[in-house]
Amino acid sequence: MTDRRTFLKKSGALAAMTMASASGLKASGITGTQVERILPGRLKRGDLIGLVTPGSSVTEEQLNDCISKLEEMGFRTTYNDTVLSEYGYFAGKDQERADELMEMFTREDVDGIWCVRGGYGSIRILDLLDYDEIRKNPKVFIGYSDITALLTSIYQECGLVTFHGPVGTSDFNRFSLKSMKKVLMEADGDYKYPYKREKGSRNNPEFDQYTLSGGRAEGALIGGNISVLDSIIGTRFEPDFQNKIVYLEEIGEKTYRVDKMLFHLLSGSNLKQAAGIVMGVFGECNINDAPTLSLKEALDDLLIPLNIPVSYGLSFGHIKRMVTIPTGIMAAMDADKNSLMLLEAAVV
């Protein structure tokens, strides 16, 4: 892994709250969005997937690689000519990228939308999207990292469940594929997320699983990349974390920067009112100049005082083996067991 900046260059209606059980389970309903929640239709072999680049640009080789991966899953693909556009570090100008995404939502023949890459730029098109049209044309939308801005905003503005999972440049290995297919292609709930440590990470503490604060919680899922979430605090697209299970990941930020961004999220939003927090892998966020806190020490300092269940090390983030997490779906976490389980289907 490389630091985040180098990495970027390289690559519904409110549900009633359930009462806490005698075992100490903290439970919460689906809150925060004032519109009715919508589940997209499940993906099936033969479906047409629209490819988009809402952030950084991609090469023709990366696009073709993405197409090959999706075809191996049994999908067909389509894309606009602008998918290979370049404007500085963006995949075209803001309006171009927004129009590209809107075209895929409004095209009746497109069944799902896959981001080819993250990078940077999604935040700049949030104000340019027609959320009413997106709501009228619900479909699977998947990506991660920079795409966090779109995942949270589309969910909160439209009620549409979105998916934090591999982009087209990610590794479509057996572990990741199994999770993608389970979440995107099967309309069943009760899915307990698997865990598999990355190869070659045995001596890397960033891949260790551990509990910061024990306990169990239920709530709708919301979250993504910390630096992206931090960047939309104070905007109309600021995520509502209250009574949610918040999932967080990061890459290539020194510990003091993770500390600063997480502190801002805690101070500038309602993250303190989350039902629980589950963290993925914070790759290369533990490389620091002395004197410093370790990543674990910084996370402990900030999150243990919240007195909610918090765990670290689930298989998501900027890693090869990642699970697919649906924003807006009810889930249960057990911080003592470092487990996360979907309680309902994410597609219909």
What are these regions (language model features)?
Residues S23-V58:
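C-terminal segment of N-terminal export signals and the immediately downstream linker at the start
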Residues R76-Y87, Y247:
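Short beta-strand elements in bilobed, periplasmic/extracellular small-molecule ligand-binding domains
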Residues Y131-S153, V161-G168:
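Short, acidic/small-residue loops that bind anionic groups at enzyme active sites
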